[in-house]
Swiss-Prot record:
Expression by tissue: Expressed in many cells in the fungiform and geschmackstreifen taste buds.
GO cellular component: membrane; plasma membrane
Glycosylation sites: N86, N87, N94, N134, N290, N478, N528
SUPFAM superfamilies per record: Periplasmic binding protein-like I (SSF53822)
Protein task: Putative taste receptor. TAS1R1/TAS1R3 responds to the umami taste stimulus (the taste of monosodium glutamate). Sequence differences within and between species can significantly influence the selectivity and specificity of taste responses.
Location in or out of the cell: Cell membrane
Protein name: Taste receptor type 1 member 1
Species: Rattus norvegicus (Rat)
Length: 840
């Protein structure tokens, strides 16, 4: 809306000048050429005086010391192109193109030129019409202007008429908006691509801490905005950003303040997205402030402009890299300019003060050149001239299609701007092996050169160090071609904080994400290079040490069969089983002997069988835990040992009853013997323990589990039984049985020698208590894969103690002291006990 308001205001201002001051239409030679169809060319042959105006007058362009050599070359490029097309028999064969060229040195001159071309031939005004389809003007298309600010104004004025406007230098993204600027096209790539190239250039060197300077106007301000919006999400921080004012002067307070802030920003890299006019003011201020040792990244408008390189002292500011539209040559342009200089030797005719001629179509310097002092056609101007060349050819091809031209003739009918615009959008042709075409936004795809300034003393040139293709943008840079300003030709570093060490994540300090502290990642987390601000946790099956950048697979551990400790325990358990089976065979062979009968007779086989069951449970502790193994290992051992303790308890209790209570309490003894008290106790005790185990298996079912918490780098495969309520109930029952056994054996400590088992039983129970105390102590401090081995060792010690304390002495008598295994010896022992009891 601001643009439209400005356009309307300027139009009203210019009407005053037009109506009262501009009565003559004389022009300097070379500004116009008659033809069947005319093109309007808008070029800045002079610079804007940037003066403050108090009256709505059009700026006079032809002022001393304001000549613009670059605009002159573009002016000549259009003249050359039209002449080349007119001399061609393949393009517009019987049609002659003409032109009206204008010097648009200022915004007012630009608007004035646009309105003058749109005006009707006779009355010199623009008729207000309801339908603009049949609107006709002296030209069919515009070429230019040369900057975004002027192009926005011209495009807005021409848009309602759908008058084609093909610019050769206006690159701002805003001009791609077809709803605002429907008739605008360009032969220079959009700044949308330039911004992408510049951001990728920064990324390729790792520069993430930059300053950003733009020029006043659409080109610089929109370019800076687009660059910041694209750079920040990619990890680039803008430490300082400012705009060079339109009225900036070297040494004024505004520029001094900018230089101070730029120095305080501590950035090595400064991106200058500016038109060349304000860029010159900026760099003169840089030289004055002695801001050296930096890398300056140039936008295409000034990257290879001699207007900037001519600033005194600029060769000492540091390294200059830039983005430039790919270099192209216009064959014959230089010779054309030389012939023009030789042909035009007379001075232009004088124009009355205030006439149109003195405003927009007069170039006094153009007629004073010789072939020796004419403006040098450098690479920057030649590249821009080629885009003028493309623009004129694009219009010519569109007109060729609109007129239905054959190889020999074109139809001659009325041509309306909107019709020609449609055809220009459709053009697609080769021009010196380069494709010329437009997309739906009127933009053309091209290529950029990545350049670096090169100084040889006072002589300046530039080196093409790479290129950038578009859609998508891809950079190819040869970094070895760059001569850096620092020591040892090293690539400068531009960061707020140096990169963290491996395994350290960033904690942002302040408002810029490029300024951060480095904090080490904790164990179990790692730093993913795609997210440098967060240490990510490892997966369940993974682990990581402190300060890690990756996770490692956890080692799965369990008590394997082939482990040395496993082999030792298996061998010991197998030996115990063989001893138990051998003892059972030995007792069966000597079943009717006094030793076996005094040990319990048939009850011995139940005791040996329970020990065998407990011993067999140990094999389920080895190998990877499975459901059957977890169900069997602890309950089977606990039940077997409970039966053994029940038998041992009742055997000790029964001996006490026989020797001590049979005579003192005969009624109790008879009741106990008649009701099979010993067998009933064993059955009841074993049944209680069996019910505990069944409840354990149902309510707190042991099952295989993977334990992750104990060791960060290990996964322990185990069964969930040790900490369950069922295990504690079963273990408590066995403790009670052990205490009962100890009490009963202690009561029989004075029994006959052959029946006195107090010492052996106490030894067995002592081993039982010690082994399980050791196991639980170890389990509280060690939770590794060898814990099942400790469990087996404790159980094996318990069973071995029970076997050795009760059965081993009897086996010794049977095998080694057979003379003691007879009735006479046992009777003598009983008689001796009776005599001792009688004396007391």
């Amino acid at each position: 809306m601001l643009f439209w308001a400005a356009h309307l205001l300027l139009s009203l201002q210019l009407v005053y000048c037009w109506a009262f001051s501009c009565q003559r239409t004389e022009s300097s030679p070379g500004f116009s050429l008659p033809g069947d169809f005319l093109l309007a060319g808008l070029f800045s042959l002079h610079g804007d005086c940037l003066q403050v105006r108090h009256r709505p007058l059009v700026t006079s362009c032809d002022r001393p010391d304001s000549f613009n050599g670059h605009g002159y070359h573009l002016f000549q490029a259009m003249r050359f192109t039209v002449e080349e097309i007119n001399n061609s028999s393949a393009l517009l064969p019987n049609i002659t193109l003409g032109y009206e060229l204008y010097d648009v040195c200022s915004e007012s001159a630009n608007v004035y030129a646009t309105l003058r071309v749109l005006a009707l031939q006779g009355p010199r005004h623009i008729e207000i019409q309801k339908d603009l389809r049949n609107h006709s003007s002296k030209v069919v298309a515009f070429i230019g202007p040369d900057n975004t600010d002027h192009a926005v104004t011209t495009a807005a004025l021409l848009g309602p008429f759908l008058m084609p406007l093909v610019s050769y230098e206006a690159s701002s993204v805003v001009l791609s908006a077809k709803r605002k600027f429907p008739s605008f096209l360009r032969t220079v790539p959009s700044d949308r691509h330039q911004v992408e190239v510049m951001v990728q250039l920064l990324q390729s060197f790792g520069w993430v801490w930059i300053s950003l300077i733009g020029s006043y106007g659409d080109y610089g301000q929109l370019g800076v905005q687009a660059l910041e919006e694209l750079a920040v999400p990619r990890g680039i921080c803008v430490a300082f950003k400012d705009i060079v004012p339109f009225s900036a002067r070297v040494g004024d307070p505004r520029m001094q303040s900018m230089m101070q802030h730029l120095a305080q920003a501590r950035t090595t890299v400064v991106v200058v997205f500016s038109n060349r006019h304000l860029a010159r003011v900026f760099f003169r201020s840089v030289v004055l402030a002695n801001l050296t040792g930096k890398v300056w990244v140039a936008s295409e408008d000034w990257a290879i402009s001699t207007y900037i390189t001519s600033v005194t002292g600029i060769q000492g500011i540091g390294t200059v890299l830039g983005v430039a539209v790919q270099q192209r040559q216009v064959p014959g342009l230089k010779e054309f300019e030389e012939s023009y200089v030789r042909a035009v030797t007379a001075a232009p005719s004088a124009c009355p003060e205030g006439s149109w001629c003195s405003t927009n179509q007069l170039c006094r310097e153009c007629h004073t050149f010789t072939t020796r002092n004419m403006p040098t056609l450098g690479a920057f101007s030649m590249s821009a001239a080629y885009r003028v060349y493309e623009a004129v050819y694009a219009v010519a091809h569109g007109l060729h299609q609109l007129l239905g031209c054959t190889s020999e003739i074109c139809s001659r009918g009325p041509v309306y701007p909107w019709q020609l615009l449609q055809q220009i959008y459709k053009v697609n042709f080769l021009l010196h092996e380069n494709t010329v075409a437009f997309d739906d936004n009127g933009d053309t795809l091209g290529y950029y050169d990545i350049i670096a300034w090169d100084w040889n003393g006072p002589e300046w040139t530039f080196e093409i160090i790479g290129s950038a293709s578009l859609s998508p943008v891809h950079l190819d840079i040869n970094k070895t071609k760059i001569q850096w300003h620092g020591k040892n030709n090293q690539v400068p570093v531009s960061v707020c904080t140096t990169d963290c060490l491996a395994g350290h994540h960033r904690v942002v300090v302040g408002s810029h994400h490029c300024c951060f502290e480095c904090v080490p990642c904790e164990a179990g987390t790692f730093l993913n290079m795609s997210e440098l601000h967060i240490c990510q946790p490892c997966g369940t099956e993974e682990w990581a040490p402190k300060e890690s950048t990756t996770c490692f697979p956890r080692t799965v551990e369990f008590l394997a069969w082939h482990e040395p400790i496993s082999l030792v325990l298996i061998a010991a358990n197998t030996l115990l089983l063989l001893l138990l089976v051998g003892t059972a065979g030995l007792f069966a062979w000597h079943f009717h002997t006094p030793v076996v009968r005094s040990a319990g007779g048939r009850l011995c086989f139940l005791m040996l069988g329970s020990l065998v069951a407990g011993s067999c449970s140990f094999y389920s502790f080895f190998g990877e835990p499975t459901v059957p193994a977890c169900l069997l290992r602890q309950p089977l051992f606990s039940l077997g040992f409970a039966i053994f303790l029940s038998c041992l308890t009742i055997r000790s209790f029964q001996l006490v009853i026989i020797f001590k209570f049979s005579t003192k309490v005969p009624t109790f003894y008879r009741t106990w013997a008649q009701n099979h008290g010993a067998g009933l106790f064993v059955i009841v005790s074993s049944t209680v323990h069996l019910l505990i185990c069944l409840t354990w298996l149902v309510m707190w079912t042991p099952r295989p589990t993977r334990e992750y918490q104990r060791f960060p780098h290990l996964v322990i495969l185990e069964c969930t039984e040790v900490n369950s309520v069922g295990f504690l109930l079963a273990f408590t029952h066995n403790i009670l049985l052990s205490i009962s056994t100890f009490v009963c054996s202690y009561l029989g400590k004075e029994l006959p020698e052959n029946y006195n088992e107090a010492k052996c039983v106490t030894f067995s129970l002592l081993l039982n208590f010690v082994s399980w105390i050791a196991f639980f102590t170890m389990a509280s401090i060690y939770q590794g894969s060898y814990l099942p081995a400790v469990n087996v060792l404790a159980g094996l010690t318990t069973l071995s103690g029970g076997f050795s304390g009760y059965f081993l002495p009897k086996c010794y008598v049977i095998l080694c002291r057979p003379e003691l295994n007879n009735t006479e010896h046992f009777q003598a022992s009983i008689q001796d006990y009776t005599r001792r009891c009688g004396t007391t």
